[in-house]
């Protein structure tokens, strides 16, 4: 997994583990901030180039039916596709008394039959590929897909593992990319609110 390229110089947040080792080694070239607004409707927008000050969300890439249909209430089914539970714990925290994302009508549900979309965490192992596919097809149309965490965005540390099967992401459109190891609750909340047009960026 290579999050950094040298020619041209870029940093791919979808592959980044946020260990900050690169910033320690090259403090004049790389600087991490506390800005949690790093989600995007475009995978390409997660690639940071020299001079970039923030990650662009690109609302024009959001399917127009998403804010129209899910702006008042959004029910999500979370699938841990071989994740390490770090992103899953942060997603759980998004509904606690500190963040209270449920006040906007966004909640996690136990069954894909009751969901409007799926939130994928983990690198998507071969053992979870079929289960994820079944979950996706169990969600009624129209539906959306959110990938959450660097493992889900790129495979993370396991991107070159033979135990990973990421064909799902080639078959279905991803509506929201949320990097992070793990993804902060505010990153998740901000990304979903932008996707649903619940706030002005």
How would you describe each model-predicted region?
Residues 50-97:
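N-terminal, charge-rich interaction modules
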Residues 99-104:
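Short gly/ser/thr-rich secondary-structure transition/capping motifs
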């Amino acid at each position: 997994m290579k999050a950094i390229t040298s020619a041209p110089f870029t940093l791919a947040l979808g592959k980044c583990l946020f260990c900050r080792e690169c910033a320690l080694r090259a403090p004049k070239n790389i600087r991490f901030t506390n800005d949690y607004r790093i989600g995007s409707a475009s995978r390409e927008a997660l690639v940071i180039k020299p001079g970039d000050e923030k990650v662009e969300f690109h609302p024009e890439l959001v399917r127009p039916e998403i804010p129209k249909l899910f702006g008042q209430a959004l029910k999500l089914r979370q699938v841990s596709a071989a994740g390490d539970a770090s992103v899953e714990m942060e997603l759980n925290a998004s509904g606690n008394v500190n963040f209270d994302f449920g006040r906007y009508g966004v909640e996690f549900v136990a069954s894909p039959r009751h969901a409007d979309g799926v939130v994928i965490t983990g690198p998507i192992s071969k053992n979870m590929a079929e289960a994820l596919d079944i979950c996706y097809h169990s969600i009624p149309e129209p539906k959306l897909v959110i990938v959450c965490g660097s493992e889900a965005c790129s495979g993370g540390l396991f991107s070159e593992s033979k135990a990973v099967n990421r064909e799902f992401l080639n078959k279905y459109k991803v509506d929201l990319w949320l990097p992070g190891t793990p993804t902060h609750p505010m990153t998740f909340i901000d990304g979903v609110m932008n996707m649903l047009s619940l706030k002005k960026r």
